[in-house]
Amino acid sequence: ICPSCGGRSDAISEIFWCQECQVPIYEKTCPVCGQEGKKLTSDVRPVFPEERLLLEIILEKPFAFEKDSVWNGNGNNYFVNGKKIKFSVKDLKNKDTDAIRKQYEELKAQNTYQYFEEQMERFILCNKERYNRIVEEAKGYIRSMTENFDITDMFVSFSGGKDSTVTADLVTRALSNPQIMH
């Protein structure tokens, strides 16, 4: 909720990097350690161990980032411990894809989720307050939009994708009714 007008918040995203916690944060000040973050990007997603290993092989540095916090930002930018690394998709056309595939197959059994899971736990811890605020705002909006309708007249358009899955979950939780058609 916008503190000025009381309306819905805008979905403008500025993502910062917490050097202490080694994860992206959605608030300028990390709610866990209190350190001020530096601007990172406007969109970010975790790089899973499989993609991380492939990236390392392409860069000719297998397992170089295994214990690091690796993220993908908008524009196919990769960040390792908050620093952008040099990587260009267009350079892939000069690589031997068969050799990359072979090396990946040889190394994938040594790949691990241990450090990735630790980073995800830290990311969730550092961003849970914002997540909870967004969920509560969404549930409040759903309740306000449905207050004049009978539950039997409601349904959620459901394709099975991640967006409709999240929407169905939010509607079910907001209205405390798992029977809503979707």
Please annotate each region the language model reported.
Residues 1-39, 43, 54, 65-182:
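ATP-dependent adenylation/nucleotidyltransferase module used to activate substrates
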Residues 46-61:
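Intrinsically disordered, low-complexity segments
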